[in-house]
Amino acid sequence: MRLRKKWWARPEIEASDKFADEPKELRGKWNKEFNNNNDIHLELGCGRGGFISQLVEKNKDINYVGIDLKDEVIVYAIRKVKEKEEEVKREFKNIKFVTMNIMGIAEVFDKNEISKIYINFCNPWPKERHNKRRLTHTKLLTEYKKFLKPNTEIWFKTDDKELFEDSQEYFKESGFNIEYITYDLHNSDFKENIKTEYETKFETMGMKIMFLKARLL
């Protein structure tokens, strides 16, 4: 679905201290931006922030960067974090948001700068000629490896079986070991799951969610 342009989105996100306006200038300097040496985790395609806002609240000693393509999406993610701050009466200083095309992500993060990646319900790009746009494709996994620390995990969730099975091959081809996998996350023994907005919706529809953890060898 194409988002309608919202003229007010860019001014609103630029006014937020949780928005990184020039992310390429922070390459190799993200810990300085957060003013600590804590691990940095990414959510690629963070959407409206339902998932990452829960992580930020739960793990104050981990820094998070949420990335999405459109200002019109990130503006709601920033609002979601603000709502969470008001709810718990605590300011979150461990979160930044970026609007960018993930294809250029290696220009934003430096070697060994990132400790974990979350990819939730990304576009499955079912047409073969578009497969390289998948966030789990070998082309992008190769880019991620440029800035991931050794033994880094990528957590991947989807409702699309074809994407899930293709992604297993992408991870293996790219030097990752799949350490956990389930085709029915909500009926599995995995206890660390945090639900996204899409996931909650899919659950009410009776759809099965697939999940894997892949570790960089």
UniProtKB/Swiss-Prot annotation:
Its EC number is 2.1.1.33. It catalyses: guanosine(46) in tRNA + S-adenosyl-L-methionine = N(7)-methylguanosine(46) in tRNA + S-adenosyl-L-homocysteine. It is an enzyme of class 2 (transferase). Keywords: Methyltransferase, S-adenosyl-L-methionine, Transferase, tRNA processing. Pathway: tRNA modification; N(7)-methylguanine-tRNA biosynthesis. Residues 129-134 are annotated as: Interaction with RNA. Substrate binds at K127, D159, T196, E197, Y198, E199. SUPFAM superfamilies: S-adenosyl-L-methionine-dependent methyltransferases. S-adenosyl-L-methionine binds at E43, D68, N101, N123. It comes from the Bacteria. InterPro entries: SAM-dependent_MTases_sf, tRNA_(Gua-N-7)_MeTrfase_Trmb, tRNA_methyltr_TrmB_bact. PANTHER family: 3-DEOXY-D-MANNO-OCTULOSONIC-ACID TRANSFERASE/TRNA GUANINE-N 7 - -METHYLTRANSFERASE, PENTACOTRIPEPTIDE-REPEAT REGION OF PRORP DOMAIN-CONTAINING PROTEIN. Catalyzes the formation of N(7)-methylguanine at position 46 (m7G46) in tRNA. This is tRNA (guanine-N(7)-)-methyltransferase. The gene is trmB.
